[in-house]
Amino acid sequence: MSSAAPAPSTHAAKSIRKNGKNWHDNKKPFRPNGGLTSYTKRAAARKEQEAIKEYEKELREEREAERQAHIQRIKERRAAKEEKERYEKMAEKMHRKRVERLKKREKRNKLLNS
């Protein structure tokens, strides 16, 4: 009886298996789509997506700016209308010349305060 030394396996073991079944092949992770696209293609697609997102963001910002400008025009128009109505009410109570003087004074104050 000779010493029973285990015969070296035909394939080189990369690492020792945790469960001790070293005669089985090491399993690799199941990745069906793993190597189908190259890194350069993925990088190009990512770059293209980023460009599209940037363009969409610019469009959204432009649309929002137009919307804000429209809102601002409406507010200015309403303020002018209210001011005109206020002066008309004042004109009913006072003389025309005095209303014009008050208008000038308010415009001066508005310019100084702004």
UniProtKB/Swiss-Prot annotation:
Presence of the UniProt keyword Coiled coil in the record: yes
The family this protein is said to belong to: Belongs to the CGR1 family.
Biased composition (Basic residues): 94-114
Name this polypeptide is given: rRNA-processing protein cgrA
Ribosomal protein among keywords: no
Region (Disordered) location: 1-47, 77-114
Keywords: Coiled coil, Nucleus, Ribosome biogenesis, rRNA processing
Biased composition (Low complexity): 1-13
Subcellular compartments: Nucleus, Nucleolus
Gene of this entry: cgrA
Biased segments, Basic and acidic residues type: 77-93
Organism per entry: Emericella nidulans (strain FGSC A4 / ATCC 38163 / CBS 112.46 / NRRL 194 / M139) (Aspergillus nidulans)
GO annotation, cellular component aspect: nucleolus
GO BP terms in the entry: rRNA processing
Function: Involved in nucleolar integrity and required for processing of the pre-rRNA for the 60S ribosome subunit.
InterPro entries registered for this protein in UniProt: Cgr1-like
Predominant cellular place of this UniProt entry's protein: nucleus
Coiled-coil region list: 40-101
